[in-house]
Regions:
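Autoinhibitory propeptides
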Residues: 92, 111, 118, 125-225
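Short, well-ordered junction/capping motifs at the entry into regular secondary structure
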Residues: 386-392
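Fold-level signature of zinc-dependent metallopeptidase catalytic domains
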Residues: 2-17, 21-114, 184-381, 392-396
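Domain-wide signal for the mature, well-folded portions of proteins, strongly enriched
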Residues: 112, 123-127, 133-135, 149, ...
Length: 408
């Protein structure tokens, strides 16, 4: 079922309003997966989306259940790897765009470091609540295909329904639930699928390779809608150059890389997504980032490993986050450097720090504008410059983060 929205002048049938109203009411009451605030305005901002009902199947495609949430305990992970029925593998099917899509997903083994910590701060380290990796894992990567024509990659979190990204026929799609899953219900859980470039941030997040390099050695992602076609041409030229470079690089020995990452969500993020939902949301976004860097098209695999997640329940006195992206980045870079453990062998030492904010940031001025992210170019090996700031725009946030990490 596909719904189109093309502005206030669009006319709709009474049936559309009844169905859409039901979906919006359900979405408004769902409080699911950190999307509490993204209700009617989110769906109205989508020019096109499709309502789908994924279901779980076995490896041969036989129906198992409409309950699609799936978590793997650390004990299960250790004891059953390599065995038939291994819970670290999970399979789904759904109808999308006239195709029967099959998902073959495997637990993302490196998204969370073995010593991963979540830290909730209430204005400083004093009184902070720190806990280690939870008892279960629910972030997966793998393949998606249609038996007739297509095959692509997917990065899906299954903590509460299916949330993530998949790519088919050079197009990228987001999937997310519209309602909370229930152990007691046998009915299918309603989800929506929408293209990356029909999301509310279409003009904002043109491509992860776009951005303006400023004289101070930073790179900012902006959203000049009028320049969309120009940036698309730049992207195509860039991809052609990268393909030529990859052909040369592939002659050398492939080297796997690891990037240990600190992720910080500011108080606006926590307020927006909810204290309970923000952790799952942030890790779902980082799972998409991980999937982007594991794509074979970039050459050598790069593992994005989250070693520490800091959730700021209250603002930090020595961390100033404003609309001014440059000043905010400068403050964050100093703040994260003080937090970092010097010894690389330490479990929570990080190579790069990522700040996620709901502030409407802007390069060079302290007022809202189109900037989505900012980072220092080539700063990975410099602790005071290995940091970035990204504005939360929903699941497309993953592409902003990936863009900024790409400049390291």
């Amino acid at each position: 079922m596909i719904y189109l929205h093309s502005g206030l002048a669009q006319t709709f049938s009474p049936i559309y309003f009844l169905v859409a109203a039901g979906i919006l009411a359900m979405f408004d009451n769902s409080k699911t997966f950190g999307f509490e605030q993204e209700t009617e305005s989110f769906l109205q901002g989508l020019p096109q989306y499709e309502v789908v009902h994924p279901y779980r199947v076995d490896a041969k495609g036989h129906f198992l259940s409409n309950f699609v949430s799936h978590r793997v305990s650390r004990v299960q992970r250790r004891e059953t790897q390599g065995e038939p029925g291994n819970p670290t593998r999970v399979f789904y099917q759904l109808q999308h765009g006239g195709h029967n899509l099959h998902f073959n997903l495997t637990l993302n083994p490196h998204l969370l470091a073995p010593g991963f910590l979540t830290e909730r701060r209430y204005g400083g380290l004093e009184g902070a609540k720190i806990h280690s990796q939870g008892p279960s894992l629910c972030h997966f990567i793998g393949d998606v295909w249609d038996l007739a024509t297509m095959k692509g990659r997917a990065a899906i979190s299954t903590c509460d329904g299916l949330t993530g990204l998949f790519k088919l026929s050079q197009e990228e799609f987001f999937i997310r639930p519209l309602e909370r899953s229930s152990d007691e219900s046998t009915a299918p859980q309603v989800h929506i699928i929408y293209k990356r470039h029909t999301s509310p941030t279409q003009s904002q997040l043109v491509q992860p390779i776009s951005g303006d390099h400023t004289t101070n050695g930073t790179c900012g992602v902006k959203d000049p809608a009028a320049a969309l076609e120009r940036v698309e041409r730049q992207r195509e030229r860039w991809e052609r150059r990268q393909r030529r470079k990859r052909r040369i690089r592939q002659r050398s020995i492939s080297r796997e890389k690891w990037v240990e990452t600190l992720v910080v969500a500011d108080s606006k993020m926590v307020e927006y997504h909810g204290t309970k939902g923000v952790e799952s949301y942030v890790l779902a976004v980082m799972n998409i980032v991980s999937g982007l860097f594991l794509d074979a098209s970039i050459g050598n695999p790069i593992n994005i490993v989250v070693v520490r997640l800091i959730l700021l329940e209250k603002e930090e006195e020595d961390l100033k986050i404003t609309h001014h992206a440059d000043n905010s980045l400068s403050s964050f870079c100093k703040w994260q450097k003080r937090l970092n453990v010097k010894g690389e062998e330490d479990a929570v030492h990080h190579d790069v720090a990522v700040l996620l904010t709901r502030k409407d940031i802007c390069t060079a001025i302290n007022k809202p504008c189109e900037t989505l992210g900012l980072s220092h170019v080539a700063g990975m090996c410099q602790p005071h410059r290995s940091c970035s700031i990204s504005e939360d725009t929903g699941l497309p946030l993953a592409f902003t983060i990936a863009h900024e990490l790409g400049h390291k």
